């Protein structure tokens, strides 16, 4: 899941392990995971804008040796000038004056910055430091001009040439470089002595100690990418030269000699940090299909002097996500509470007892889930605001750290780490924000299944395949447009209570349990309603009569019971009395 870094992307941070000879952020602790360096990978990805590639292949910027020269105080009476020169791997110009001349001096593409000096920069006798100062040359060099795009560089390209001013005879004005060898490694390894001789004075053109900053100007215009040079310069060690230019007399004519010697080389290492990585191997870029393929490539984070330029380097970064088509064997549901609600209510409808309490409990669960999502959304929104504030507050603190103390260098490295970390965190938070805004199926946690229905007529499989490869040139597959469609579908689900269909089924079931509906179904006419009223009155009457009869029977039983109780009480008290009295008593 990687996507190429293109010329339209912002420059990334490339860290070197030596700040005295190479400007920019430094870090000698890379790679972070040495055991994972060189992992094999096969890639087949697409692109929209031209990708950034380094190496000897179509669509890639080719390497070349570049020199940077400074003057030092003269130490010999026969020397016109004394030099210190640094040679290292850089980016090769591809000059075509007839086709590329309009680009080379066009003010439209000229960057803002200080012009390069008119004189060679002065330096002390100490060769242990090199002060870099960014400047803009009088004309640009063409690094690439083909079907992949036009890439230029406004950094100075210093080299020796003949000074023909004031010369009456024919003077060869062609530029000559002390490193013109076709074999790059041979020019930096085997040739440790350079000598240039001529009857004309030697001059150094394109003064200035500045690093290349290539940028694309066609078919689109993008930002400068100074980090690419830090990758190429670390692919081979840099060589330090010392020498001078002497003036002699030959055949009664002045004779000029530039003599340079080298006995010092410095190995370098350049690294990128996640989410960026380097794909190294036989990379093939196909502009017709806008795809990049590489089989049996290696995935690296660092480049050092052991790199072989028979391979190519492709800058890639981890992809935030991809939209794919899926099919489900069940209805799409937004949360587990909806699923539980549906399953529970199926059983509850068959058993009406405790239905209201269960319904209240489930609804309270839905409210709790909704409240949790709302709180999470607020927290995420606050986090995004904090990241934007940090991004606005954070400034580009990359300077010429080689002229600062060691503690300033450490602070600079921490700031660079913070900046790249903040950018990475910002991308992750934006991805999380989109994730929270989407309505996803509850039964998948590693990825999000949205309720958006796939329309084959609008997005046929070729478009989907291009999207999976990373190509976004088709407007119908533009990610932002697709997200808007999915957000609209999600909002449609958010406008309704989750589980609306299940709750609607419950409402229908409750309506069927209502006796009033039965009466309405049976008694839809006045006669039936009247008969029902008479039946009700008859039943009421019958109940009243039964109640009265029961009360009378109860009164008779009470009197009989009282009489029997009185007779039982007087049975023994009448013995010895006269028969008359007994009769009277009985009569009473």
Swiss-Prot record:
Distribution of this protein across tissues and organs: Expressed in teratocarcinoma cell line.
UniProt xrefs under CDD domains: HIV-1-like_HR1-HR2
UniProt GO molecular function: structural molecule activity
InterPro entries xref list: GP41-like, HERV-K_env, Retroviral_env_glycoprotein
Renumbered residue ranges of the record's region Fusion peptide: 355-375
Family that this chain belongs to: Belongs to the beta type-B retroviral envelope protein family. HERV class-II K(HML-2) env subfamily.
Assembly description: The surface (SU) and transmembrane (TM) proteins form a heterodimer. SU and TM are attached by noncovalent interactions or by a labile interchain disulfide bond.
Anything else known: This envelope protein is encoded by a human specific provirus.
Identification of the protein by name: Endogenous retrovirus group K member 24 Env polyprotein
Originating organism: Homo sapiens (Human)
């Amino acid at each position: 899941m990687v996507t190429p870094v293109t010329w339209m992307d912002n420059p990334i941070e490339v860290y070197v392990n030596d700040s005295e000879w190479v400007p920019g952020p430094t870090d000698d602790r890379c790679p972070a995971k040495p055991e994972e360096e060189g992992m094999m990978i096969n890639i087949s990805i697409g692109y929209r804008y031209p990708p950034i590639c380094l190496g000897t292949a179509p669509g890639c910027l080719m390497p070349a040796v570049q020199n940077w020269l400074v003057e030092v105080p003269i130490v010999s009476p026969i020397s016109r000038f004394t030099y210190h020169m640094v040679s290292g791997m850089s980016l090769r110009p591809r000059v075509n004056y007839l086709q590329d001349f309009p680009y080379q001096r066009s003010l439209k593409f000229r960057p803002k910055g200080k012009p390069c000096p008119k004189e060679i920069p002065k330096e002390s006798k100490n060769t242990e430091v090199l002060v870099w100062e960014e400047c803009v040359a009088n004309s640009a060099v063409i690094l690439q001009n083909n079907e992949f795009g036009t890439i230029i560089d406004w950094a100075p390209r210093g080299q020796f040439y003949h000074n023909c001013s004031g010369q009456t005879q024919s003077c060869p004005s062609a530029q000559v470089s002390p490193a013109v060898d076709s074999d790059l490694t041979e020019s930096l390894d085997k040739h440790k002595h350079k000598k240039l001789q001529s009857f004309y004075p030697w001059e150094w053109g394109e003064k200035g100690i500045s690093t290349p900053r290539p940028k694309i100007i066609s078919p689109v215009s993008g930002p400068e990418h100074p980090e690419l040079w830090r990758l190429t310069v670390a692919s081979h060690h840099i060589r330090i030269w010392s020498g001078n230019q002497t003036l002699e007399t030959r055949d009664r004519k002045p004779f000029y000699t530039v003599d340079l010697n080298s006995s010092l080389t410095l190995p370098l290492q350049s690294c990128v940090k996640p989410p960026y990585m380097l794909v190294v191997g036989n990379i093939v870029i196909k502009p017709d299909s806008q795809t990049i393929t590489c089989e049996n490539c290696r995935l690296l984070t660092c480049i050092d002097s052991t790199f072989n330029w028979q391979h190519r380097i492709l800058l890639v970064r981890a992809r935030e996500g991809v939209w794919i088509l899926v099919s489900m064997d069940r209805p799409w549901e937004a949360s587990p509470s909806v699923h539980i609600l549906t399953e529970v209510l199926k059983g509850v409808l068959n058993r009406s007892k405790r239905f209201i309490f269960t319904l209240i409990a489930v609804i309270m669960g839905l409210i709790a889930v909704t409240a949790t999502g709302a709180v999470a959304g607020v927290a995420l929104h606050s986090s995004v605001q904090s990241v934007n504030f940090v991004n606005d507050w954070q400034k580009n603190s990359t300077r010429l750290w080689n002229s600062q103390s060691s503690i300033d260098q450490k602070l600079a490295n921490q700031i660079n780490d913070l900046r790249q970390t903040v950018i990475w965190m910002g991308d992750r938070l934006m991805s999380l924000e989109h994730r929270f805004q989407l309505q996803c199926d509850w039964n998948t946690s590693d990825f999000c299944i949205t309720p958006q229905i796939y329309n084959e007529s609008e997005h046929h499989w070729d478009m989907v395949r291009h999207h999976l490869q990373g190509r976004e040139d088709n407007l119908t597959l533009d990610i932002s447009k697709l997200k808007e469609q999915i957000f609209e579908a999600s909002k449609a689900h958010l406008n309704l209570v989750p589980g609306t269909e299940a709750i609607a089924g419950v409402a229908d079931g409750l309506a069927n349990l209502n006796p009033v509906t039965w009466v309405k179904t049976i008694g839809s006419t006045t006669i039936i309603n009247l008969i029902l009223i008479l039946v009700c009155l008859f039943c009421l009457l019958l109940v009243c009569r039964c109640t009265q009869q029961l009360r009378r029977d109860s009164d008779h039983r009470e009197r009989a019971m009282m009489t029997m109780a009185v007779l039982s009480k007087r049975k023994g008290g009448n013995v010895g009395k006269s028969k008359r009295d007994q009769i009277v008593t009985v009569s009473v």
